[in-house]
A protein has these predicted regions:
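Class I SAM-dependent methyltransferase Rossmann-like catalytic core
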Residues: 2-19
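Conserved alpha-helix/loop element of class I SAM-dependent methyltransferases that forms part
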Residues: 17-36
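Conserved class I S-adenosyl-L-methionine
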Residues: 138-161
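Core SAM-dependent methyltransferase catalytic element
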Residues: 175-193
Length: 193
């Protein structure tokens, strides 16, 4: 079994926060207390924990990941963060089959995930299924530039490629921003298809 200790430390590091700050990314969609959010591909909680802090004790955050080691690290990080663990529901599942109730989520976030999704049609069907009609969808991913960290350049999607994938799967991009030196953020809404 692979040791994820160093990866978890890096995923939760201040260095990474300088690349793309979760609080800033969430402010771009106006998170309010009591919202229900989903972090698809949550890993050890880099976005999950700030999402829980933003939505507060009356909110709910679903943290979905297939990697049990990452989810165990998430549990540890939640305990250390002081966030009420009752507002975070951890789901060990593929991001295309989450089990999250239909039409229940105000904000769906997937960070550094889209370039890895093999069955994008199934993934976006699930995103649409769990989203409220008024939901915001946030895609944060690696810019298609050469960097020291991150996936190989050939696996990355440019902003235009990601926008096209989103559009083809029923989501319109309403805002595009830099999410730091290595990442972009696309804020979307479900469209009628």
């Amino acid at each position: 079994m692979e040791d994820y200790g160093d990866r978890v430390k890096f995923f939760m590091s201040e260095e990474r926060k300088q690349w793309h700050n979760p609080e800033t990314i969430l402010k771009n969609v106006g998170v309010v207390k009591g919202m229900t959010m989903a972090d698809l591909g949550s890993g050890p909680g880099f976005f999950t924990i700030p999402m829980a802090k933003a939505t507060g004790e009356k909110g709910l955050v679903y943290a979905v990941d297939t990697n049990v080691s990452m989810l165990n690290a998430l549990k540890e990080n939640i305990a250390m963060s002081g966030v009420d663990s009752r507002i975070i529901e951890i789901i060990n599942s593929d991001v295309s089959h989450t089990g999250i109730p239909k039409g229940s989520v105000d904000i769906v976030l997937f960070a550094n995930v889209l370039h890895e999704v093999e069955d994008r049609q199934a993934f976006f069907q699930e995103v649409r299924r769990i989203s409220k009609p008024t939901a915001y969808i946030i895609d944060v991913d690696w810019k298609k530039i050469k960097t020291e960290h991150g996936p190989p350049l050939k696996e990355r999607l440019s902003e235009d490629e990601a926008k096209q994938v989103l559009l083809e799967n029923g989501f319109s991009v309403i805002k595009q921003t830099d999410a730091g030196p290595y990442h972009y953020e696309l804020i979307c809404k479900p469209t009628c298809i």
